[in-house]
């Protein structure tokens, strides 16, 4: 069987410039929708993790209060040592705890949350690491 050259009509098969531009425009629209949604999802995830870390800390904080009758002198290292608290690495005690109140903070992926405890078994979450 002899080799025969393929005859063409002068046009190559492929996509035109207009077709490629339309596909790029569609991809751009999809990215404009997907990227903000993804960023919002990751931010909500980080907030949820920070809140969960703080909730896990509160039983140790209240156990400290039950043992000592005050929050004064409470430290993260002391909570870890005395109450076997599985405290997350980002958890910190802000300021100096008083006899009746404390502030525990957690920063997860740049999102700061705080728990301000005005007394035994009562607390409130605040965003932006604000305990005041």
Please report, for each region that a protein language model flagged, where it lies by residue.
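N-terminal leader/signal peptides at the extreme start of proteins
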Residues: 1-15
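N-terminal single-pass transmembrane signal-anchor helix
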Residues: 11-38
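Conserved catalytic core of two-component sensor histidine kinases
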Residues: 24, 51, 58
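Regular, well-ordered alpha-helical segments
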Residues: 32, 40-43, 59, 63-66
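Aliphatic-rich helix starts adjacent to a transmembrane/signal segment
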Residues: 37-54
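Periplasmic/extracellular, small/polar-rich flexible segments of pilin-like filament-forming proteins
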Residues: 59-132
């Amino acid at each position: 069987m002899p080799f025969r050259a393929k005859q063409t009509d002068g046009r190559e098969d492929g996509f035109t410039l207009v077709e490629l531009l339309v596909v790029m425009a569609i991809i751009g629209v999809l990215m404009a929708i997907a990227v903000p949604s993804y960023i919002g999802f990751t931010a909500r995830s980080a907030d949820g993790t920070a809140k969960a870390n703080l909730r896990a800390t509160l039983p140790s904080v209240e156990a400290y209060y039950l043992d000592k009758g005050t929050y004064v002198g409470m430290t993260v290292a002391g909570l870890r040592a005395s109450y076997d608290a599985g405290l997350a690495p980002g958890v910190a005690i802000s300021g100096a705890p008083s006899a009746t109140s404390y502030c525990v903070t957690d920063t997860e992926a740049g999102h700061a949350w705080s728990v301000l405890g005005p007394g035994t078994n009562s607390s409130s979450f605040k965003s932006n690491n604000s305990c005041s």
